[in-house]
Amino acid sequence: MAEKKVFLFRSMASVIDQALLSGLNLLIGLALIRYASKETYGLYTQLFAAGLLTTILLDSLIGSALTTLSARLPADERGRFVARAAKIHWVASALLAIPAGLVVGVLAKLLDFPVSPVVLGLSFSSFVFAQASREYCRTALFIESQAVAVAKMDMVFVLVTIAGAAAFFMVGDIGTPHIFFLLTIANVVASAAFSSTLWRSTGRDIKWGQYLADVNVLWSLSRWAVIGSVVGWLGNNSYLYFSGAIAGVVALADLNAARLLLMPIVIVGMAWTTLARPAMGEMIANSKIHKLRQFVLKSTLAMESFNLIYLGGLFVVYPWLIAHLFGEKYGDISNLILLWACYFAVNTARNVSTILLITYGIFRELFWQ
């Protein structure tokens, strides 16, 4: 009974945490829908998705393998391993952030974006590194089952972002580089304290050979997870670039507006994922296979039930949303909402099986998902 209460408490903290983050993304999206042109909103979603890819790559490269391995280690050894992996993660983040910023800057020049290519590239590069650093802190805290600490850190991130956005609105328009610089500052402020703790926890007597050994251990598990994550990202986000290239960013804005209304489904799925990985890892480590099966089945049924209930409620308030929020420029997007709902129903079941494979350490099969 006590174990169930603890898991329920962590679940609520995780849901609140994801609600904060997704709510922030929702506010940004709604503000762009309401006050910006379709072209601006469409381009923003493409660039933000590219930033998301780098975070996913780092999580699959280090975070997923770290979660799997940590469940099998004693507490003291786990803490040292997580701290050493933090430095590996920071180096990998920099190696991804720098070329990502260069690519964005070059594309901004070639495609004649109405912003400075240098400023846009710098803002994007700094955002990628800062976002990745905070995501690692979240992973490390979840490994230690500190869901409340994660929620507090993300609360700081949300508050700093909102305060900065309010300041920008007071002085004038917000451009894309301003948004990424603001998110960089918010990520740094939120994760600075725990990042400092991780840095000090490694000590000064760690040899390079130890880091190389850790890299080899992580890579032995994560190399297939990286491929699987890239395939998963393409499945979730390739429409941004194909639809933008074929139908234009105006049509892309309609697609994203419909998807934005289903954000609560994403919130629940992400909250479950962050909690399920360490919980399932513990079940596997203790050979509680029957309990694991029940957990997977009940999780799938619960999330699919939520999907149906939310979709029904959404269509009840849909006329009001169109009239008072989206306006005439978006028109009727109900068919797009239904198509997205079908996609999320299938993706929910796929996500459960993906996390199960990751937790087992069976990363190669992820490639075929």
Range-by-range predicted roles:
Residues 1-3, 7, 148, 152, ...:
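Interhelical loop/hinge segments that connect adjacent transmembrane helices in multipass membrane
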Residues 5, 9-25, 47, 56-105, ...:
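Membrane-water interface segments that mark the loop-to-transmembrane alpha-helix transition
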Residues 5-64, 101, 162, 223-250, ...:
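Signature of the first transmembrane helix
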Residues 58-75, 143, 258, 262-287, ...:
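Helix-loop junctions and terminal segments of transmembrane helices
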Residues 118-125, 151-202:
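Hydrophobic alpha-helical transmembrane segments
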